[in-house]
């Protein structure tokens, strides 16, 4: 949508995402209750039980239509060598959690490096960070890796779970409602997804 706006094809667009976890969570619980489940099957299936459900919509416009907040730009990278570390379907998700965490952090570090090079990011000039809502271990490792202050973020995974791609805009919306985002803030939105894919975006509030 942002590309279409910049190319002059449209003036405004709506980006929508919805995540529903009930089906896969219930199917996973049924599988884990079977008598033939061993520790390996449990380990691969357990992350599914952390999923949540939610929906978001974001309106993007040309600067002529709105001056409130600005999407400055983004950087992204993929590392498809690790595409098999998380495999999902409507009925099952299998996750090699430790390997996924390690590979995801490596990709995040490279993507952050692009942000430093092309967007001028560093640990002192980003005012607020909204990251992918997976869990406390992932957050701590990511913030330590970049030298970021965890007081400059907000998390929703303890109450909403991991709502996939919906997590970042959903968490941002709640942070705004709670008055955590101030005018002039440089916001960094950091998403890491299975594939592996990583996208980091800056918004000037």
Where are these regions (language model features)?
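Short beta-strand segments
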Residues: 13-19, 60, 189-192
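Structural motif
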Residues: 12-14, 56-58, 69, 128, ...
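Condensing-enzyme catalytic core mediating Claisen C-C bond formation in acyl metabolism
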Residues: 34-106, 110-113, 192, 204-205
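Secondary-structure boundary elements
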Residues: 3-12, 61-68, 122
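Acyl-CoA/ACP chain-elongation machinery
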Residues: 6-29, 79-83, 136
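Glycine-rich helix-loop-beta junction characteristic of Rossmann-like nucleotide cofactor-binding loops
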Residues: 119-121, 179-180
């Amino acid at each position: 949508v942002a590309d279409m706006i910049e190319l002059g094809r449209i003036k405004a667009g709506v980006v929508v995402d919805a995540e529903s976890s009930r089906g896969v969570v219930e199917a996973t619980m049924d599988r884990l209750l079977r008598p033939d489940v061993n520790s390996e099957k449990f380990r691969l299936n357990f992350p599914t039980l952390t999923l949540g459900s939610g929906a978001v919509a974001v309106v993007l416009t040309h600067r002529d239509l709105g001056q409130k907040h600005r999407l400055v730009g983004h950087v992204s990278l993929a590392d498809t060598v690790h595409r098999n570390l998380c495999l999902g379907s409507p009925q099952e998700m299998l996750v090699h959690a430790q390997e996924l965490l390690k590979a995801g952090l490596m990709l995040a570090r490279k993507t952050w490096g692009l942000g430093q090079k092309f967007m001028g990011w560093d640990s002192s000039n980003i005012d607020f960070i909204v990251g992918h809502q997976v869990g406390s271990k992932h957050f701590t490792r990511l913030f330590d890796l970049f030298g970021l202050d965890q007081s400059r973020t907000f998390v929703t995974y303890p109450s909403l779970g991991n709502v996939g791609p919906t997590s970042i805009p959903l968490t941002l919306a709640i942070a705004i409602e709670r008055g955590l985002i101030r005018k002039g803030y440089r916001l960094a939105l950091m998403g890491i997804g299975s594939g592996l894919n990583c996208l980091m975006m800056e918004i000037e509030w």
